Amino acid sequence: MPQIKGPAIFLAQFMGDTAPYNTLPNITAWVKSLGYVGVQIPSWDSRVIDIQKAAESKAYCDDLKGQTNGLAITELASHLQGQLVASHPAYDELFDGFAAPEVRGDAKARAEWAVQQMKYVIKASANLGLTVSPSFTGALLWPFMYPWPQRPAGIVEEGFKELAKRWTPILNYADEHNVDLAYELHPGEDTHDGASFDQFLEATGNHPRVAINYDPSHFVLQCMDYVGFIDLYGSKIKAFHVKDAEYRPSAKSGVYGAFLGWKDRPGRFRSLGDGQVDFGQVFSRMTAIGYKSWAVLEWECVYKDSVQGATEGAPFIAKHLIEVPTKAFDDFAGAGSDTERNRRVLGLS
């Protein structure tokens, strides 16, 4: 069995305009001091990467790797760009801020920009020697997630058909560069659980570059079997966000969460160890399926400060990493290989 790599950290939630959070050398020095050995870079944040330059220049990428204080670049995350590949008009204004200023207010131009950005991420990943980018699919169907009023016949199929149409050229480009797109199954995306992932995968013709960024927190908040999911979709899991969550329903609110803010919702993300995810089981199953990439902290918590969350995250992940065995635990009782002996034991000779 291969061994999971880590601990690594997704930098998005920690970026800022003052040191040590404002440049790649500064922030990697900080997270290295906390015990992290890898960083997942938010490809949309110009404070740590110029994604177009990274796509166009291998020399730039080589220089970028030299700015990380010896830490590995685990992946280039592309969630915000992926979100804009497909956006229902109801969310146009809310998502506009994810895009470059020159395409805001123009849904068609914004989607075209997002497609180009995804291609930059893919080429930059290849230039950095990376083989996966965690992302979002975006959403055309999310406003119709609850079946009331009754959905028009065929609307779900049409939605996934269009989603696949938009993503297939990007996936083909990813295939040319040996990069998987690991979609995070996340509320607000048309792919938010296993069943919706299956619908998208089928609509793409089972495209080989469609993969999953596994994040158990989103499944806790949907009351799903997040450990069983690993066994069911293990061959598709190519990235791993280590994020905790808790679901504490009340007599007033449950899974939908009314319109409450994060602090008051029954379902909320938590710092590692403060929620309900059984990470012992998660890391055991991830090891069992042969997951061999990175365990990356994604920190989100309404109660705890980000610095405390990052500080606690590295030892938490390190504690859960499993050193795979070099021999079977019962080798001491083995008798070696002997064909004739095996045949005698089977009563064949």
Protein language model annotation of sequence segments:
Residues 21-26, 30, 85-211, 331, ...:
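Active-site acidic/histidine proton-transfer and metal-coordination neighborhood
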Residues 306-329:
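C-terminal helical cap(s) of enzyme catalytic domains, especially alpha/beta-barrels
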Residues 40-41, 73-78, 130-138, 179-184, ...:
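Short beta-strand segments at enzyme active-site cores
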Residues 40-65, 137-145:
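Glycine-rich, proline-tolerant flexible connector loops at the mouths of alpha/beta enzymes
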Residues 2-7, 12, 22, 38-39, ...:
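Acidic/histidine-rich catalytic cores of soluble enzymes
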Residues 2, 26-35, 53-75, 92, ...:
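Acidic (Asp/Glu)-rich catalytic clusters
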Residues 14-16, 296-306, 334:
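A short, acidic, flexible beta-alpha connecting loop/helix-capping segment that sits on the rim
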Residues 47-48, 82-84, 140-141, 187-191, ...:
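Short, small-residue-enriched loops and turns at beta-alpha junctions
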